[in-house]
């Protein structure tokens, strides 16, 4: 599953609902998610450590914040890239990074872009390759 969303609506009628206790199942899922991000960050950090290129992190959103707070080596990261004009020239909440347009990559053959945008990865990668690095 991609995401879980809840919609709550106030109802004046009182109906007693008993929810199934899913604590143990949810605890396992949460532990798996933490391990997933830990492993992903270790993998990305190995690339960051050995690259001489300028490093950029794509996406001024929770995906990037998760990587950063899971131990991403941010010393070589120049800035956060995002297509959203409303996010550009602002700081990514909870970080020191300013958000810039991916167009700063034009004519930069010495860049490594970390892309961790879930189901949007293919679309973003295609846009960078076809419209920025052409």
What is each of the regions a protein language model found here?
Residues 3-134:
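Hydrophobic, well-ordered beta-alpha structural blocks that scaffold small-molecule cofactor pockets
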């Amino acid at each position: 599953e991609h995401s879980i969303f809840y919609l709550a609506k106030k109802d004046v009628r009182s109906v007693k609902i008993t929810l199934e206790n899913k604590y143990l199942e949810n605890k396992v899922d949460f532990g798996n998610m933490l391990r997933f991000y830990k492993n992903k960050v270790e993998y990305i950090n190995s690339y960051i450590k050995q690259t001489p290129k300028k490093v950029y992190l794509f996406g001024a959103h929770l995906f990037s914040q998760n990587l950063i707070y899971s131990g991403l080596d941010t010393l070589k990261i120049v800035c956060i890239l995002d297509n959203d004009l409303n996010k550009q020239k602002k700081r990514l909440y909870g970080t020191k990074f300013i958000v810039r347009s991916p167009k700063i990559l034009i004519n930069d053959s010495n860049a490594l872009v970390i892309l961790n945008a879930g189901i949007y990865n293919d679309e973003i990668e295609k846009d960078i390759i076809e419209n920025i690095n052409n």
